[in-house]
Amino acid sequence: MNFGPRPRNNRTIRQYNFALTGDIQTTLDNEKVARSFTLKLFEAEMAANDRVAVLFMPRSERLDSPFNINIAPGRRVTLPRGAEYDFLRYQVNWRTSNRRVVAFDGRYEAGDFYSGTRKEFVNNITFRILPGLFVYTAA
């Protein structure tokens, strides 16, 4: 479900976006394995095609097999089959237009991760050398 109003007579902001999406995964016996929702609390799309958004993402998961997680170099934890976990994650993402000579896109995400927490920062830089010729970097 998406709602995307366009402000009138605004030279800076082209459109606001608000959305709710959901996904439910089941086994062949119709037992729930995972349920996730993404609530886009706010997204602003600028006239120059730049964007910024804030998302809220609750998720529920029941492991159908043991799951190994690396918690540090050389240290692993195995989560048992059948264990159930509820996550609540938040995300801020951004993107500038690829029409720019130097463009940025990325995200910061934080929140629950199985029996702990996780923070993730991703930022990519794109250089437009010539029209149609790009160099992409990722960090």
Explain the meaning of each model-derived region:
Residues 2-139:
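Exposed, low-structure sequence patches enriched in small/polar residues
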